[in-house]
């Protein structure tokens, strides 16, 4: 009887230790996955941010179009355009549009948001990008915090939300000074135009803004 109790105790201890080991392995695997996700997200943000900084030149002959043309392909590569497009007009409106209307809007939205970012940095020289860190965001997203430092001026806080799209982390929103969501800002801005002119009216309005951006230099 005594031997049986010892055997049972040993078996119970073995089961507990096995459970602890499995939990430990699960936590380790999750930690490794989290580190890989953070590293991948950081790489995306750093690539775009460095491209944004590089688009600003001290050479006065560099035009808005030069900066725009340099940044647009990097924007398209690293931003989740489908998420951005749907979020900036709202799910109900988005689902009412045809595939071709959605595609046309994504194309002009990419150019409009790129142009907006180019204009934000056009008047300041001496930009320097600093990566602050990454933290978990809502709905399995990640938030990457960065600074755009400027000569003799306060740095600009730029935070990026990233979501996984097709197994790859992509930027789905930008927050200026940790508060102003680019998606929320554009949705509020576009809503009136959509109500009065629909998809075609919004396309025309954005094309007009892009023309004004280029004319302003």
Predicted ranges, named:
Residues 3-16:
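Bacterial N-terminal signal peptides that target proteins for export
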Residues 14-25:
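Bacterial N-terminal signal peptides
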Residues 28-35:
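Boundary at the C-terminal end of the N-terminal hydrophobic targeting segment
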Residues 36-43, 54, 58-62, 66, ...:
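Surface-exposed, polar/charged faces of alpha-helical domains
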Residues 38-117:
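Early exported N-terminus immediately downstream of N-terminal targeting peptides
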Residues 106-107, 111-156, 206-217:
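Surface-exposed, charged secondary-structure patches
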Residues 155-185:
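Short beta-strand edge/turn micro-motifs at domain boundaries
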Residues 175-217:
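Low-complexity, intrinsically disordered terminal/linker segments enriched in charged
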